[in-house]
Structures are given as C-alpha cells and as structure tokens.
Amino acid sequence: MTVSRGFAGRRRGGARDDLPPGQYDEGAGWPVLTAEVTPHLDPQHWTMSVDGLVDTPTTWSWDEMHALPQSDYDGPIHCVTTWSKFGIHWSGVSVDVLLDAVGVQDTAKFVLATSTTGYTTNLPLEHLRGGQAWVAWEADGKPLSREHGGPVRLLVPHLYFWKSAKWVTRLTLLDHDVQGFWERNGYHDLGDPWREQRYQGD
C-alpha cells in the first residue's frame, strides 16, 4: 500500500480559535472513514484486555466494563483527512481506570491498541494517562454506532482520530514502539494535530 493525500476535505471560512492548523469544522456532519470492512459485533461477546508489561493482565466483559467508574469527554475530535468535529458528548471509562486496575510496570513506555478486526495503532503510554483517553461506548447519549467504532472504541481526542481505534479489544503495554497499521504505511507515529503530524517526517 502507498500513502496518498486522499480523503480530501472541504475548507470553510470563519475558522475558530480551537481549530488546529489545516483543519475545517465539519459542523453537523460526522464522516465515516475506515481502512477495513465494518464488523457486526455483539456487545455481549466483546471483551477488553489490557496486557503486556502489567502486573495483572486483565480481560473485562461488556458488563464488567460498565460496572467500572465511568466518565465523560466533551470536546473536539480531529481527523487526519482535515475535518474536525465539535460538540460530541462521549461516555465510557477512562483508560486511567484500566491502567490502575492492572498495575503498570516501570518499563512500560508504549501501547499497541488492537481492534477486533486486527487493526492496530501505536501510542506513547504518556498520551493515554492523566485523563487524556477513554474506552468509549456512547456518543451524545446513544450507543456508539458500529460505523463509528461501536460497540466500543478507543478515544484519544488530542491526537488525530486514526489513533482512536474503532472496535478496540486490547491494549498491550510495551517497552518499545511497535508501529500500527497506518504508521507502517507512512502516517506519523504520534499524530499531534496542533503540529500537523500527519505523515512520517512532519
């Protein structure tokens, strides 16, 4: 596969102060972009695992995840294809809750997120801690649709949205960086929208 500048978005005037460079406000729309076939997942058969460099590798069922302390996120999301969306109310569990439950080892520095489809994306561990990331299953008070990653997706809103893996099922903590799907194909390893880190070398 080769990486192109595809999925070109449309730009609009009146940019807001909280809009990163090169982005446009999508408004009421919410584009659906994916690198794979959208799966049909039964929430009762879905599980969430956190493993790797942790003291107690743990797998939660759908019901067990919902029994954990929940929290919300209200704020923008930014897609690498140049659209941003404001005003979605997300609900789920902070990744901090999961990390506290498993016990993170001192040597853990990176995370590889894996979806039920086999899609992967890599993140520095520090970008999942401190109230920066969630495992989310609701958007605007409704179950997250499968097109947008439901029943559950990773939500890392301060990075480009390909880092918020749809249909997430596993977080593996590592002492070294392992590139995910898009990163192996030329996308940036971090993906900070305020620094326009879209592609390797940006």
Please report, for each region that a protein language model flagged, where it lies by residue.
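Structured, non-membrane catalytic/scaffold regions adjacent to prosthetic-group chemistry
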Residues: 2-202
